[in-house]
Amino acid sequence: MNVSVVTERRTPAYSSLAAGELNGLVARALLTEARLTPKPGLVDIRNSGAHRDMDLAAFERSTTAIAPWMEKFFIMGNNTAALAAENVLVMLRPLGMACENDMLQATNGVNTHRRAIFAFGLLSAAIGRLLARGEPLEQNRICDQVARLSRNIVAHELSAKKAGKLTKSETHFQCYGLSGARGEAESGFRTVRTQALPVFNRVVQEHDDTHLALLQTLLHLMAWNDDTNLVSRGGLEGLYYVQQQAQKLLWQGGVLVEGGIEAMQSLDDELILRNLSPGGSADLLAVTWFLSHFPAGSLYPE
C-alpha cells in the first residue's frame, strides 16, 4: 500500500510573531506531524499505529483544543520577561494543567499531546520573552530561552528521592539515566538542533520535498533519540530494537531511495505487532517543523 500525502511548502522564516499567529503555527506543526504517513508505530493516515485508544481524528480534536492555549503561554512569557527565567516555570504550570484538561475533554480522557503541551508551552513562553525584550526570533535564541525556563528541572523533578512509588519518568531517570521530555527541554532541544533540523534542512534543499524531509528526519530521531515512550512500552529492549531498525534503514538510504517508503510501512507493521510507539520522537518532529520556520541565528546567543 502506497500512501501519498500532500504537504505544504515551507513558509518564509518569521522575524516577528503575534500571539494569535502562534496558535496557528503550533496547530499546523501538530497536524503536520499527525498526518505525516507512514510513521512506524505512530498514529497517521494509514492506521493508528501501536495505539488502541486513539486515532487521527482524536489527534485533530486534541489539536483544536490545545492550540488556543499557546497564546496564553506566549502572554505569560511576555508579561514576565523581566523576571529570571527559572522563576517563570512555576507560573506556566497552571496553564499547562488547564490546557491538558481541555485536551482530555476533547479526547474522552486519552493522552494524545501531554508531552507536546509541555514542549510547545515552553516554546511559546520563550517567544513571548524574546519579543518583550526586543530580541530576534531565532532558533537558537528560542531554544536558549527554553533551556533557561527549564533550568534544573531534571534534578528537581526526576532525581530527588521521594516517598511512595516512582512515576514512570522518575523510574526512567533513576534506573536508566533517561531524562525524557524534561531533559530535552533543559538542553534547549539539543536533539532537534543538532540532529533533526540539519537533516530536515538538507533534504528540503536537495529534494524540495517537505514530506520526504519529515520522514527522513523521523528516522534519524528514531535512530538516536532515547525515547522514553518506547521504554515505557518495551523496556530498554524495545528502545534498542527501534533504534537499530531505524539505523538499518538509514544505512540503506532511508526514504530517499527506491523502496524506502515501503520499508517504513514494513517497520510500521512490525512495531504495531510489538506494541512499540516512538511518541517522544514524534513530538520532537513537530518541534523540528515548528522551529524550521525561524532563522537559525547565532549558535551562542548573548
Curated annotation (Swiss-Prot):
<keyword id="KW-0547">Nucleotide-binding</keyword>
<dbReference type="InterPro" id="IPR002736">
    <property type="entry name" value="CitG"/>
</dbReference>
<keyword id="KW-0808">Transferase</keyword>
<dbReference type="InterPro" id="IPR017551">
    <property type="entry name" value="TriPribosyl-deP-CoA_syn_CitG"/>
</dbReference>
<dbReference type="GO" id="GO:0051191">
    <property type="term" value="P:prosthetic group biosynthetic process"/>
</dbReference>
<dbReference type="GO" id="GO:0005524">
    <property type="term" value="F:ATP binding"/>
</dbReference>
<keyword id="KW-0067">ATP-binding</keyword>
<protein>
    <recommendedName>
        <fullName>Probable 2-(5''-triphosphoribosyl)-3'-dephosphocoenzyme-A synthase 1</fullName>
        <ecNumber>2.4.2.52</ecNumber>
    </recommendedName>
</protein>
<dbReference type="Pfam" id="PF01874">
    <property type="entry name" value="CitG"/>
</dbReference>
<dbReference type="GO" id="GO:0046917">
    <property type="term" value="F:triphosphoribosyl-dephospho-CoA synthase activity"/>
</dbReference>
<comment type="similarity">
    <text>Belongs to the CitG/MdcB family.</text>
</comment>
